[in-house]
Amino acid sequence: MFVAGNGNGRVEVFDLNNDGTLAQPTATYILGKPSEHARRTHADAWSESQTEFPGALAVEHSNQRLFLVDNTTGQSLPGRGSQIMVFDIHPDRIATGADVLFILGQPDANTKTSGLAANHVGRRLGVAVDEANQRLFVSDGSNNRVLVFNIAPDRIATGMAASTVLGQEDFTSREPGLSIRRMSRPGSLAFSPKDERLFVSDNGNNRVLVFDAAPDRLRTFSAATDVMGQPDFETASPRTDMRGFA
């Protein structure tokens, strides 16, 4: 089990029993810091083995990798951004203080600037993995979009470009919107492998968008197939009943 701790600026890894209960109350490994006693001490302290402000994470079991969003202190400051760190979590190779395998969303592990490109993200990120098709979905909240990366072992690379973008017509646009194709400040993501649907929390519009994410049908600027929390794709009113969100 992987637990991202913002206060300590690290990820704690716990062993579980076969029934899902904790094997022991203490973490077995620490990712993002060199030892079990290390914690976040000051801003701008990150590297290939150091996390600063870990957030959303997703585990990919087939290749045993952890995709972790690492934010920077002072996210509201101009120019600050986030990155996605990819760790090897194979039982034979995982280790406290291990270096990352790859960095996505930034050119390297030492960069956390807010950007707008196929290979450069902003901040307020969410992640979800499609294991069968080896894809990583990344919600880029400050750029009002969702990026799709090919994470196959023979394709993934530090600083790589996304293959598809949702919510925008291209990789250099970031306008928020309210429609069947646009979104505003997307956050949490969930992927359903059974029917290949992607659920996007469209925070700025008080709704959840549902996309047909089958590889042969998902395209840049695809239209959502369904909306939850609103009666249609043109409404964004906050609601407090059983059918709405706020």
Predicted region positions:
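Short loop/turn segments immediately following beta-strands, especially the blade-tip
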Residues: 14-24, 87-97, 150-159, 211-221
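Residue-level signal for WD-repeat beta-propeller blades
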Residues: 5, 24, 51, 60, ...
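Short loop/turn segments immediately following the C-termini of beta-strands
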Residues: 6-7, 16, 71-73, 79, ...
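Surface-exposed loop and turn segments in beta-propeller and other repeat-based domains
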Residues: 25-49, 96-119, 160-180, 222-245
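A short loop-to-beta-strand structural motif that recurs across blades of beta-propeller domains
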Residues: 9-13, 29, 81-86, 99-102, ...
